[in-house]
């Protein structure tokens, strides 16, 4: 075991070439994959927007609801992934197999529960986002678009959950290229069939919003097929997949350990995701225009956010592997370097987003007032990006050492205790502009950054959990 030594300021801020080369090898495929995913999401959004503002708003509402499911899957698989990264760092392939099996079982259960929930309560959930000020005709049309889109998208939950199990395990072992290739090919399929089915090009029918949903579901099955076939054809590269389906037995002690650390993470992701859904609902009381503008803002900002989000995922991988190998000082050094890198990247990407803010909304076929509102919201998102990036990297650092209860308090509790009450009060009891409300709510992340800085500095997360 490496001695836990003090670090110099320079060691914390700057790495050597080997460090940046290693981080680049891990993070670049993730950035490419996720950025392309979000570019295609933007193109999807624009194509749906060509149909009209109401279809775009209906799709945005369903997207926010499904986002909670996505986070539940990510939370459940990431909890096991903490162990997977450390098992891989220790060279324990059987341990990685067990964590993969755990992911499959839990994600299947979550997917089944989500499908039942959305079939039973999808309509009232959608209606909560339609402002009382919306005309009856517009409200009925938005609801109809959203219901049709949701029903088709539920089919895509099955391949999505399975893909996350495979892709997450591959990334935890440092193998990020195959998930990237699968995602890129799936995005091509998604884009092509979006164009064909939304607008009815060639012999294909004009399906509008339903066509967008069908294209997305089809692309998810393509992505799953590529990842599964590619991974099982190269088991010498992915040895943890050898014999992985011979049994689903997982040692009870490991299941207990994963549950102890996974449950706070799963609850955190679901509470954070539902918190984001409630925030959108708070903003939606200002009218359907606010929902449309926020949809444009979030879709565009997400492309630029992928740099710090990918660096956060890379932090969990590289720091987790250091902890699993018992290089505790190396883990601390790596964490501080990743925080510095994330903050610097956010300054650059935030500036780029602010520069692009007046131009990108113009590709949408919507009212000029919505474009102008989206531009102002994008500028606020750009201003807050360094806060988002620093807090995200702190979150993944704490999580890498298994401190999932602390991350639960740090992330979702903050959302529900600070962000949601502020958005609720400001949107309902003040006459503040939606842009000002958005800035106040997101600017509160500076408190989260300060709390995370103290926790990372104290080193409460520096633990090898697979040795315990």
Role assignments for model-derived ranges:
Residues 32, 44-48, 59, 84-89, ...:
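Hydrophobic/aromatic residues within transmembrane alpha-helices of membrane transport systems
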Residues 53-64, 146, 150, 213, ...:
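Small-residue hotspots at the loop-to-helix junctions and early N-terminal turns
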Residues 1-27, 84-156, 204-262, 319-384, ...:
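Short alpha-helical transmembrane segments in multi-pass integral membrane proteins
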Residues 77, 152-171, 179-187, 212-228, ...:
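Short runs within selected transmembrane alpha-helices of multi-pass transporters and secretion channels
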